[in-house]
């Protein structure tokens, strides 16, 4: 993921190598003395995954196989300095990736966990849209759009980084992807179902997120039910509680889930 807020620095201090992958900057000269910075989101064209820019860390988990009784989570962060992605695969969220004032300011990390609910595996992905400081609130709509646009890249990073696991358990490619958008603004505080992982990780032809194939999006009446674990102790649900410490504040009306951005625009 790239930076989701514009850097407030003078044009002379902008280093092309430190530009976010999601924003480009243009300088517009109004006079010899005054210049303004115009952040232009790179909103057009497909999001592209580059394997050479992904660093994968396995922390306390098996690279190829995964015991059914151990959680498996993904923590993905982006560096504006190196333009590289770091993916930690572990039993819990890798908090060391999220430390520092810069990460707390940008909040462009994506975290996810595998869950088994009533015998079915699904991938639950969390994104922070707004809340915490005014800059995030100011750019909430843009952040939501960019997260949606870039999520196929994020999911592709998960698939590529954990490819040995998916080779050993190919059925995970059919697991549904649930995306939780966390925001203090009701419009963006919601859950979306992005369909099977193999489709959600593929950019749509329009370049917009929600990379579901035609067979998935053709029926606009499809309603997905967010899987809920059994209330009593069982063997068909794991883990019993989410290992991601974000509050469950997303809006779910009547137990149904909104579909991805591509579906909304079709």
Curated annotation (Swiss-Prot):
GO CC terms in record: chloroplast
Membrane-traversing stretches: none
Result when mutating residue 114 to R: In cl; stay-green leaf phenotype during leaf senescence, and brown color of ripe fruits
Single biological process term from Gene Ontology: chlorophyll catabolic process
Subcellular location: Plastid, Chloroplast
Organelle targeting peptide span: 1-50
Chief location category: plastid
A Pfam family recorded for this sequence: Staygreen
Cross-referenced InterPro entries: Staygreen (IPR024438)
Keywords: Chloroplast, Plastid, Transit peptide
Family listed: Belongs to the staygreen family.
Role noted for this protein: Required to trigger chlorophyll degradation during leaf senescence and fruit ripening.
Protein name: Protein STAY-GREEN homolog, chloroplastic
Protein species of origin: Capsicum annuum
Gene: SGR
């Amino acid at each position: 993921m790239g930076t989701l807020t514009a850097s407030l620095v003078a044009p002379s201090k902008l280093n092309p190598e430190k530009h976010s992958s999601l924003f480009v900057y243009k300088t517009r000269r109004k006079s010899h003395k005054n210049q303004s910075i115009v952040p232009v989101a790179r909103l057009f064209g497909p999001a592209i995954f580059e394997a050479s820019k992904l660093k994968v860390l396995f922390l306390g988990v098996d690279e190829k196989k995964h015991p059914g009784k151990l959680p498996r989570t993904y923590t993905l962060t982006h560096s504006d300095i190196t333009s590289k992605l770091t993916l930690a695969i572990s039993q819990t969220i890798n908090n060391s990736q999220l430390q520092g004032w810069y990460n707390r300011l940008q909040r462009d990390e994506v975290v996810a966990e595998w869950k088994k609910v009533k015998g079915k595996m699904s991938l639950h992905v969390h994104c922070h849209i707004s809340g915490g400081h005014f800059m995030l609130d100011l750019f909430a709509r843009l952040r939501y759009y960019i997260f949606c646009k870039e999520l196929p890249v994020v999911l592709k990073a998960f698939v590529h980084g954990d490819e040995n696991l998916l080779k050993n358990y190919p059925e995970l490619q059919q697991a549904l992807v649930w995306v939780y958008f966390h925001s203090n603004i009701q419009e963006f505080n919601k859950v979306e179902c992005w369909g099977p992982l193999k489709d959600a990780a593929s950019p749509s032809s329009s370049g917009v997120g929600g990379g579901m194939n035609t067979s998935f999006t053709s029926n606009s009446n499809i309603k997905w039910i967010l899987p809920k674990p059994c209330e009593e102790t069982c063997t068909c649900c794991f883990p019993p509680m989410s290992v991601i410490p974000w509050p469950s504040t997303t809006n779910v009306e009547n137990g149904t889930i909104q579909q991805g951005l591509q579906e909304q625009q079709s």
